[in-house]
Amino acid sequence: GLESTQPLEALGARLLAERRLSADGATSCLDCHQPARGYTDGRATAAPGGLNTPPLWGLAARGRYGWFSPEVTTLEAQLRRPLADPAEMGPLRDATLARLRADPALVAAYGRAFPHAPVLVTWEQSVAALAAAVHAIEPPPGPYARLLAGDAAALAPAARRGQALFVELG
């Protein structure tokens, strides 16, 4: 989930919802990566560009962040791409940072996340905070986990038969 008591994750969770992070000040990461839709936008392809909006959950275990960009091997490197892309969030880095620095509560959140930083509200701090929040997003529970949690209808009939056979045969 996005709730966290860790200052870096908390700042990142706040930035995921922060519209001022975009060049036009009107778009947040969560507008496209909607928690209620599995951190996607629910569409087969996102406009513009024709690619889908990838889910944000489960990225802590990934080593690559896109088949089309094998050079992107860290989440931070992947996050820099939409932040700099005019078709997505932006590239107005200085104007974006100025808007963020104008909010004393947000500057204080950066201070809690980066207590020893000589300068607060930098692009790299923002990327690090976003990465910490995204790394903390857990994948949704699979059918077997839901079954163990008491959801008797979680497994499809064939899976229930397989599970019964597994239990029977040990």
Could you say what each language-model-derived stretch is?
Residues 1-170:
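Periplasmic c-type cytochrome electron-transfer domains
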